[in-house]
Amino acid sequence: MVGKARSSNFTLSEKLDLLKLVKPYVKILEEHTNKHSVIVEKNRCWDIIAVNYNAIGVDRPPRTAQGLRTLYKRLKEYAKQELLQQKETQSDFKSNISEPTKKVMEMIPQISSFCLVRDRNHIQSANLDEEAQAGTSSLQVMLDHHPVAITVEVKQEEDIKPPPPLVLNSQQSDTLEQREEHELVHVMERSLSPSLSSVDMRMTSSPSSIPRRDDFFRHESGEHFRSLLGYDPQILQMLKEEHQIILENQKNFGLYVQEKRDGLKRRQQLEEELLRAKIEVEKLKAIRLRHDLPEYNSL
């Protein structure tokens, strides 16, 4: 059995030998795709690499293809981390980078570009964090001073705009009632507030003087209802006919629903009867089949 488990850690010479064996197949191994043919080709390459690696030295412990593949991935990750660390410290690459990392950079030049992109993203994220902190601090300062401004504005509004008078003299109340009665005869709105502002709002916003039918039924007083209609028997007759039509439609709809429910019940009963009949037929067929068999006839 070849190398069930690794007996010791990889030495520097073993790592360099692995990278030397991987170099001819690096183009296939670095092709990141889920195609079945590529995966099969990668497995074949790793089997060849494992055979060549185990044939280098007898004194070394045998390694599996999976173990060598794991080591190769770790070497690439370590190379990325080492490059990022060197860029952060701004030291010389050639003097401080290890030999496996140099080999990985020669085989895979994309690693250096990956580090540059990652470094740029790190700088951008740091700038965004600084901007967010600055925005938060400025917002906190604004919130600290903003309540005072709100208090001043409210006080100014209270000083400029006096409260509406709650007590009206008799002449003003009579004029208000006359205007309200005149307006209610011609315009029916949703609100019948006796205040002056609501009356003015209805006068400016209502485009027509045709009364609305849905507001006629809101009043409980019969006299008030008849006064709004202006004792017009034609309107009363139309409303009565419309009400009768609505009741008739509701009645017909109820009958339709009841008939549909009865039809569904009848259908379910017929289906149950049909199922029972089929069961009886199958039983009769089974009895006839048993009687036709020779073993039953002999009995």
Swiss-Prot record:
Protein's cellular compartments: Nucleus
GO molecular function: identical protein binding
Disulfide cross-links: none
InterPro entries: FSBP, Myb_DNA-bind_5
UniProt cross-references to Pfam families, sorted A to Z: Myb_DNA-bind_5
Cellular-component GO terms for this entry: nucleoplasm; nucleus
Keyword Transcription regulation annotated: yes
Cross-link Glycyl lysine isopeptide (Lys-Gly) (interchain with G-Cter in SUMO2) mapped to chain: 94
Tissue specificity annotation: Expressed in multiple tissues including brain.
UniProt keyword annotations, A-Z: Isopeptide bond, Nucleus, Repressor, Transcription, Transcription regulation, Ubl conjugation
Record bears the keyword Signal: no
Subcellular location, principal: nucleus
Matches recorded under PANTHER family: FIBRINOGEN SILENCER-BINDING PROTEIN
Assembly and binders: Interacts with APBA1 (via PDZ 1 and 2 domains).
Miscellaneous comment in the UniProt entry for this protein: Intragenic, in the second intron of RAB54B gene.
Protein function: Transcriptional repressor that down-regulates the expression of the fibrinogen gamma chain. Represses transcription of GSK3B gene promoter via its interaction with APBA1.
Name recorded for this polypeptide: Fibrinogen silencer-binding protein
Lineage of producing organism: Eukaryota, Metazoa, Chordata, Craniata, Vertebrata
